[in-house]
Regions:
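Well-ordered alpha-helical segments within folded domains of soluble proteins
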Residues: 106-123, 169-185, 220-236, 272-289, ...
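Long, well-ordered core segments of solenoidal/helical folds
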Residues: 70-100, 133-150, 195-212, 245-263, ...
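Low-complexity, Ser/Thr/Pro/Gly-enriched N-terminal "stalk/linker" regions
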Residues: 22-110, 131-155, 191
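Carbohydrate-binding/catalytic loop surfaces
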Residues: 87-105, 152-170, 216-234, 262-283, ...
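Extended ligand-binding groove/face enriched in aromatic
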Residues: 100-104, 121-252
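C-terminal beta-rich recognition modules with glycine/proline-rich loops and embedded aromatic residues
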Residues: 23-40, 300, 358-367, 372-488, ...
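Solvent-exposed beta-strand/loop surfaces of large extracellular or lumenal domains
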Residues: 502-527, 545-550
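Bacterial Sec-dependent N-terminal signal peptides
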Residues: 1-23
């Protein structure tokens, strides 16, 4: 029987090639796609097909996970902010002239970047207005495909200020569109996407030997993993062998991150562009699905160790402004790097099940991301600094300077890529809170208030709510809201990640102790579940420290880094021309910032650090600003008079125990990094 099914699949796979001869998606082509897809036999959700490595976690269909609480508020602010109106705010690029809508305007990455975030936002919120903004981009991309499989803009135009329209053939922006179409299929099951990608990937297999990834630009070489993961995604749907051949070819032509790590490039500055690193670092693990040599995972892990040591910043990012630029806490970290590294971590945890990647993902999402975008989601910083004491228009010690606008909150301040690309961060984070598991269970891998609808057990739909104020509270409550079968109960395993920072978690089921679990593990509760059953997960949050540049110390509690609370004076400024937008905000403070923490016993942090929690603020929909921060930590500190402003930023960092402090001890207040704009998050340590 298995041999017969295999033969049928092979025959149908061969027949699918004839789709490429169709002018477009005819009824005959649709029948062939239907036949091929119907042969896929899986559990509740599709895992990797042989010979690809089976994944321990599987992404759920787009729209299965809905945000609640503060996360829902974040996405609504995003919808009402820039994400929902880029065509109005940035019409020169996102308007009707865009090449990805058939116009003669910008035809490179920026338009696809926006849709790569807008599409998941639209379907997660189930918002018809946003879906209507997305659909013309989908339709034009699908209809643009040529007979040979190529798609997208294909005519170059003379340069025009503010537009990128002279490299229409480049492989790179098409990789972003492939991500968009994957998500669109996940939300809609539009079978045109399958035929479209099949045709394009045959074109790539035929064309890449003559016009490799680096033929038009180097960007595609560094970011080929986004192309590669789309190839594997399609292979899991159709099983066509040529896709595996293309997978090997894309890997061979891509930049070798393994060689980069082996050369020690990440131990030196300026060896790679910061966003290329954020996007491309997942390539070895994406390819590991096809070539299961452990060296691919080991290289990525070693790469992250090098990044942490030589470029690392406490909010989960690294000094990269735009080249990798060391770990001084006044070096910038680009917003594109944050959202792209989040996506890379989401994919790497799915493939490996390694919860180090999930811990890292939360560190970025709960610290770096909310700090770099304004509360109304209308402006952003191109770069952020861990020690950021002035947000002004001024040239700083960055690898790239854009007329001093890189720290300013604005629309096109710095470089426009981040204004176009920032939209994917929170929607994709929401989409990857939950995963399906091969044992027909469900896994809560990253935590935030949400609700998931998924099939478990013997393909039984369930609805599970997650109620929490995490990451600013330690308790997470899961409730089985619905079991959609006749008996209203179903047996399935419930997987729960326990972060490494948690010494020991407690899990209770319906009020009774179920188990305790050490940090850094996945707990599994496997039982018969029925409506209104509850799981309570307790993740005790203790204060601890981490050590950074010049032996500086950061204060952490749970997944959050804490930073000096400073008065923030926001002032709107007008630009004389529109190159960087029409306006920007500068943020300044009259508060002192040059504190060193008074030396303390790291083993007695619960006594040294005084934690206060405002339970009323834990009821607010939006915790991510200074006013609403529900958790504060008090620490003893002394001023360091020699630590002064340099170049409108914190001057050279005093080495811990070498700086001379002045005056008596003072009590300073720390709040979550993600609630700050001005801050010190890496403190020198001084004597008592």
């Amino acid at each position: 029987m298995k041999i017969r099914i295999f033969a049928v699949v092979c025959l149908l796979a061969a027949n699918l090639f004839t789709i490429s001869a169709q002018k477009w998606f005819t009824p005959e082509a649709e029948k062939q796609v239907d036949a091929l897809l119907s042969q896929v036999v899986e559990g509740n959700y599709k895992n990797n097909r042989y010979p690809l490595l089976r994944k321990p976690l599987m992404e759920l269909p787009l729209g299965s996970i809905k945000p609640k609480g503060w996360l829902h508020e974040m996405l609504v602010r995003q919808k009402n902010g820039a994400s929902g109106q880029m065509d109005v705010l940035y019409p020169s690029v996102m308007g009707k002239r865009n090449g990805w809508l058939g116009g003669d305007g910008d035809q490179w990455e920026r338009g696809p970047y926006w849709i790569d975030g807008l599409l998941p936002l639209a379907y997660i919120l189930d918002d018809d207005v946003l879906k209507a903004k997305v659909q013309p981009w989908i339709e034009w991309a699908l209809q643009s495909q040529r007979e040979d499989g190529f798609f997208g803009p294909e005519k170059d135009y003379p340069g025009e200020p503010g537009l990128q329209r002279d490299n229409s053939q480049d492989w790179w922006p098409r990789m972003v569109v492939l991500k968009i179409l994957q998500q669109y299929y996940s939300a809609t099951n539009d079978k045109r996407v399958v035929a479209f990608m099949t045709k394009y990937f045959r074109y790539q297999l035929n064309t890449l030997p003559q016009k490799p990834l680096g033929h038009w630009s180097s960007w595609a070489e560094f970011r080929a993993c986004d192309n590669l993961q789309a190839v594997y995604w399609l292979y899991n749907l159709t099983g066509e062998d040529f896709l595996l051949e293309l997978g090997h070819l894309l890997h061979r032509q891509s930049f070798s991150f393994i060689d980069m790590v082996d050369r020690g490039d990440l131990r030196r500055p300026c060896t790679i562009h910061c966003v290329n690193l954020a996007q491309g670092i997942k390539e070895p693990i994406i390819y590991y699905q096809q070539d299961t040599d452990r060296k691919y995972i080991d290289a990525v892990k070693e790469g992250f160790r090098d990044i942490r040591r030589f470029h690392g910043q406490p909010q989960g990012m690294y000094g990269g402004d735009e080249a990798m630029h060391g770990n001084n806490p006044t070096q910038g970290s680009e917003l594109c790097s944050a959202v792209e590294l989040m996506y890379s971590l989401e994919k790497m945890v799915e493939i490996t099940g390694d919860i180090d990647f999930a811990d890292h993902l939360e560190r970025i999402a709960f610290n770096a991301l909310p700090a770099q975008i304004s509360d109304d989601f209308m402006t952003k910083q191109y770069f952020q600094q861990p020690n950021q004491v002035m947000v002004t228009r001024h040239r700083r010690n960055f690898d790239q300077d854009h007329e001093g606008t890189d720290l300013a909150f604005g629309t096109l301040t710095g470089y426009p890529c981040c204004f176009s690309n920032m939209h994917q961060g929170w929607p994709k984070f929401t989409q990857h809170l939950w995963y399906a598991t091969p044992d027909n269970g469900i896994a809560a891998i990253v935590y935030s208030p949400s609700e998931v609808t998924a099939n478990v057990g013997d393909n039984v739909p369930v609805v599970i709510s997650e109620d929490t104020y995490y990451p600013m509270d330690h308790q997470i409550t899961f409730t089985i809201k619905e079991v959609r079968n006749k008996v209203k109960q179903v047996k399935f395993p419930f997987h729960l990640r326990v972060p490494k920072w948690c010494k020991q978690a407690e899990i209770r089921v319906n009020g009774k102790m179920e188990q305790t679990v050490k940090g850094g593990k996945i707990a599994i509760v496997d039982r018969i579940w029925k409506r209104n059953d509850k799981i309570e997960l307790y993740l005790p949050m203790e204060v601890f420290t981490s050590t950074w540049y010049e032996n500086a110390v950061s204060i952490e509690r749970g997944p959050l880094v804490y930073a000096l609370k400073m008065e923030e004076n926001w002032e709107k400024k007008e630009f004389k021309d529109s190159w960087y937008g029409s306006y920007y905000y500068q943020v300044t403070s009259s508060d002192p910032w040059n504190y060193g923490l008074v030396d303390f016993d790291r083993n007695r942090m619960n006594e040294v650090a005084q934690v206060s929690i405002n339970s009323q603020k834990q009821q607010l929909d939006f915790p991510w600003n200074q006013e609403n921060a529900p958790v504060e930590i008090k620490m003893k500190a002394r001023l360091i008079p020699t630590w002064t402003v340099y170049n409108e930023m914190a001057g050279p960092q005093p080495f811990s125990f070498c700086g001379s402090a002045e005056g008596g001890e003072q009590e300073i207040t720390l709040i979550p990094y993600g609630c700050t704009t001005l801050r010190i998050s890496e403190f020198p340590v001084v004597g008592k």
